[in-house]
């Protein structure tokens, strides 16, 4: 068996084209374009790359992009004050603060300061709670994008045994909630999980988000499983690889995401979808 590749780059581009058409229609109807404020604190190289991609994506679909690049010494109070300004700005529908933040700034305070109706990252406790209560509104971008990828396979997820490896607030935990919503029997694995191999071998649907290159051997994959690799790891030679040993895993899985070109583009596409949703549902 050789797995079919789930082309996240192509699916994300389709979404972006659809969003661009919707924004054009809004403008032609005399409505404003959605606005996204992107806040970067410090000069972390990876964060700069991510933020640049998000800003370019906004411009591509016709959103208004507000950029705030703050020095790494910016105080927590100053950052919270900027968020307050964005909260009150009627032209801004979504606020994104790029994580991680400098050590002197408490991330939970920052996340909770963003108004829930402008929390297009889907991290605010209100939005996480809505997902837990099975009435999601603004959803965490990476899990949301992954669900779009899974849907693209045409596989019925009801009753599948799903395993999520990684229990972060950004991916693992909301991912498990998303899978529960689609009828999966969901297991979350983390650094204290015993018999990880046994759990993986039972998975009809496997999502791996641990940030360790080749962490999951390909021969652990259950024949016919769907494999979603969230990891983006750069090796010494510069090559980007995922958390799953791709070549071996592709011999067992029915569908698999590549790295790069799998989950990454979908995270940004979902951010754009959330921003348009916030504009239409909350701020029109």
Swiss-Prot record:
Keywords linked to the UniProt accession: Amino-acid biosynthesis, Histidine biosynthesis, Hydrolase, Methionine biosynthesis, Multifunctional enzyme, NADP, One-carbon metabolism, Oxidoreductase, Purine biosynthesis
Catalytic activity: (6R)-5,10-methylene-5,6,7,8-tetrahydrofolate + NADP(+) = (6R)-5,10-methenyltetrahydrofolate + NADPH; (6R)-5,10-methenyltetrahydrofolate + H2O = (6R)-10-formyltetrahydrofolate + H(+)
UniProt entry tagged with the keyword Oxidoreductase: yes
UniProt cross-references to NCBIfam families, sorted A to Z: PRK10792.1, PRK14186.1
Enzyme Commission no: 1.5.1.5, 3.5.4.9
Residues reported in the UniProt entry to bind NADP(+): 166-168, 232
Record gene name: folD
A GO CC annotation given for this chain: cytosol
GO molecular function: methenyltetrahydrofolate cyclohydrolase activity; methylenetetrahydrofolate dehydrogenase (NADP+) activity
Keyword NADP tagged: yes
Superkingdom, natural source: Bacteria
Protein name as annotated: Bifunctional protein FolD
Record pathway: One-carbon metabolism; tetrahydrofolate interconversion
One Gene Ontology biological process: tetrahydrofolate interconversion
Cited function: Catalyzes the oxidation of 5,10-methylenetetrahydrofolate to 5,10-methenyltetrahydrofolate and then the hydrolysis of 5,10-methenyltetrahydrofolate to 10-formyltetrahydrofolate.
Family that this chain belongs to: Belongs to the tetrahydrofolate dehydrogenase/cyclohydrolase family.
Self-association state and partner proteins as the record states: Homodimer.
């Amino acid at each position: 068996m050789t797995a079919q590749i789930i082309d996240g780059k192509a699916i994300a581009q389709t979404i972006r084209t659809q969003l661009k058409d919707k924004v054009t229609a809004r403008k032609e109807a005399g409505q404003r374009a959605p606005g996204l404020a992107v806040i970067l604190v410090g000069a972390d190289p990876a964060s700069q790359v991510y933020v640049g991609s998000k800003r370019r994506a906004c411009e591509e679909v016709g959103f208004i992009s507000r950029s705030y690049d703050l020095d790494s010494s910016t105080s927590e109070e100053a950052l919270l004050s900027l968020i307050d300004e964005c909260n009150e700005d009627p032209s801004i529908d979504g606020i994104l603060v790029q994580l991680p933040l400098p050590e002197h700034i408490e991330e939970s305070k920052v996340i909770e300061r963003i108004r829930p109706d402008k929390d297009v990252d889907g991290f605010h406790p209100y939005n996480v709670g809505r997902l837990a209560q099975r009435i999601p509104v603004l959803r965490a971008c990476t899990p949301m994008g992954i669900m779009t990828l899974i849907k693209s396979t045409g596989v019925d997820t009801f009753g599948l045994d799903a395993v999520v490896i990684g229990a972060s607030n950004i991916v693992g935990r909301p991912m498990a909630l998303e899978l529960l919503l689609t009828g999966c029997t969901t297991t979350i694995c983390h650094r204290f999980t015993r018999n990880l191999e046994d759990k993986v071998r039972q998975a009809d649907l496997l999502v791996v988000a641990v940030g360790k290159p080749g962490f999951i051997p390909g021969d652990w994959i259950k024949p016919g499983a769907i494999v979603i690799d969230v990891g983006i790891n750069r090796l010494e030679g510069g090559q980007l690889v995922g958390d799953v040993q791709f070549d071996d895993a592709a011999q067992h899985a029915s569908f698999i995401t590549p790295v790069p070109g799998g989950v990454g583009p979908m995270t940004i596409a979902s951010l754009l979808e959330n921003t348009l949703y916030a504009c239409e549902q909350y701020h029109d």
